[in-house]
């Protein structure tokens, strides 16, 4: 198992290129199961979750060829398997995304209940209810979802009681081969969903309302789609994380390959804190702030402040003047990084889903442990400004979603080493 050793308080300067969005790539990889022609997916990030999904597709019978480190060609014309086994699915929750496409194309599938990150309840009930609304029979037996629609799926209204990103994605993929019209009401509005819509539209699926909370889908009444090649959009959470690298170290950094309007909740908050940003069509440059003011954040669904940036801003709050307040409304157990930040000297108090952070705190290097993907990046941010050396353990969480993070930060001047645990 690896850990990162980080020397704190090293000056940073330069630029970072953002990788493709993991959270866009995963549903698009799953959607290739709907296609009878080969598809090339470009700008895939080389992270553990992508490799796990690729392995799952291969296990289902898809033919995979890596054309370069970030381009994958997938042929799913002759799949021979419609069972997503526990051994593969347990590695990440996003594996549930194969449910919709397998059911739509083959009218029956067996998918293990998923595993993945430990940040609270992420029930699959919303996914199952959506499949039932399209006419599927669902049974859960011995840890497996058995879904069946002998006569194929039929378009219908799907109302989500609670906004669900992966639930919306599964419903979209299933509806793309359903007969007639499906309306998804209270759909998630993330950019990653908009890109999935673009991908499905390339195969002839008619989708109205892209980017809104109500999607109208007219399915293609064939056995499969003919999807076209696609390039994954830049990762807005990775971009936000590197903006926070600049913010917490009060450095001048330029973030390349971004889509500015995907980052507005993050950039608005950084400007409120006191940073100057030069926002261009494909890049953002952050400049040191004369004074960094405390702030308040409430996490919300897109286009609100992303829950996936909450941990990074908690680390940043330790260096701001005054007391900051962060309210987490989307997930339970998502403050597990707080106790690890406290090991570095952070002054944080928690009350249910609200964290209060006292700023202007001098952090000191220590051994800390990552508890989930975004918590790991928050600990690295804090270590960059801590006095002395920090070691961040259990970084397999980090490797699930950040491509070559230590290489990218070291290119800015940081001193970060990946080492093996003894």
UniProtKB/Swiss-Prot annotation:
CC per GO annotation: cytoplasm
EC number(s) given by UniProt: 2.5.1.7
Catalytic activity, as annotated: phosphoenolpyruvate + UDP-N-acetyl-alpha-D-glucosamine = UDP-N-acetyl-3-O-(1-carboxyvinyl)-alpha-D-glucosamine + phosphate
Subcellular localization(s) per the UniProt record: Cytoplasm
Main location: cytoplasm
Top-rank taxon: Bacteria
Annotated NCBIfam families: murA, PRK09369.1
Function: Cell wall formation. Adds enolpyruvyl to UDP-N-acetylglucosamine.
Protein's name in the database: UDP-N-acetylglucosamine 1-carboxyvinyltransferase
Organism: Helicobacter pylori (strain P12)
Source lineage: Bacteria, Pseudomonadati, Campylobacterota, Epsilonproteobacteria, Campylobacterales
Gene: murA
């Amino acid at each position: 198992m690896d850990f990162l050793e980080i020397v704190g308080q090293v000056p940073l300067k330069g630029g970072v290129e953002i990788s493709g969005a993991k959270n866009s790539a995963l549903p698009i990889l799953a959607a290739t199961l709907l296609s009878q022609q080969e598809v090339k997916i470009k700008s895939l990030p080389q992270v553990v979750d992508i490799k796990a999904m690729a392995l799952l597709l291969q296990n289902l019978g898809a033919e995979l060829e890596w054309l370069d480190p970030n381009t994958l060609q997938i042929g799913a014309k002759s799949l021979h398997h419609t069972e997503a086994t526990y051994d593969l699915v347990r590695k990440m929750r996003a594996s549930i995304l194969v449910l919709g496409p397998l059911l739509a194309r083959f009218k029956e599938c067996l998918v293990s209940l998923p595993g993945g990150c430990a940040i609270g309840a992420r029930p699959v009930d919303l996914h199952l209810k959506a499949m039932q609304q399209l006419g599927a029979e669902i049974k859960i037996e011995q840890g497996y979802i058995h879904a069946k629609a002998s006569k194929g799926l039929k378009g219908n209204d799907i109302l989500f009681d609670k906004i669900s990103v992966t639930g919306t994605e599964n419903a979209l993929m299933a509806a793309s081969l359903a007969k007639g019209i499906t309306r998804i009401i209270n759909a998630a509005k993330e950019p990653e969903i908009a890109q999935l819509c673009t991908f499905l539209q390339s195969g002839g699926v008619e989708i109205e309302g892209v980017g809104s909370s109500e999607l109208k889908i007219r399915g293609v009444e064939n056995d499969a789609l003919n999807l076209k090649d696609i390039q994954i959009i830049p990762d807005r959470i990775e971009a936000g994380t590197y903006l926070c690298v600049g913010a917490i170290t009060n450095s001048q950094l330029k973030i390349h390959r971004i889509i500015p309007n995907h980052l507005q909740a993050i950039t608005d908050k950084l400007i409120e804190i006191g940073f100057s940003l030069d926002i261009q069509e494909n890049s953002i440059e952050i400049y040191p702030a004369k004074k960094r003011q405390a702030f308040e954040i409430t996490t919300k669904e897109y286009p609100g402040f992303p829950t996936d940036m909450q941990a990074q801003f908690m680390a940043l709050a330790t260096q701001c003047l005054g007391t900051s307040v962060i309210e987490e409304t989307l997930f339970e157990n998502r403050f597990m990084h707080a106790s690890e930040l406290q090991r570095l000297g952070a002054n944080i108090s928690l009350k249910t889903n609200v964290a209060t952070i006292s700023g202007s705190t001098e952090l000191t290097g220590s051994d800390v442990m990552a508890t989930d993907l975004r918590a790991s990046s928050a600990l690295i941010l804090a270590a960059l400004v801590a006095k002395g050396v920090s070691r961040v353990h259990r970084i397999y969480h980090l490797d699930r979603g950040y491509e070559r993070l230590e290489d990218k930060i070291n290119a800015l001047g940081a001193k970060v080493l990946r080492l093996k645990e003894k």
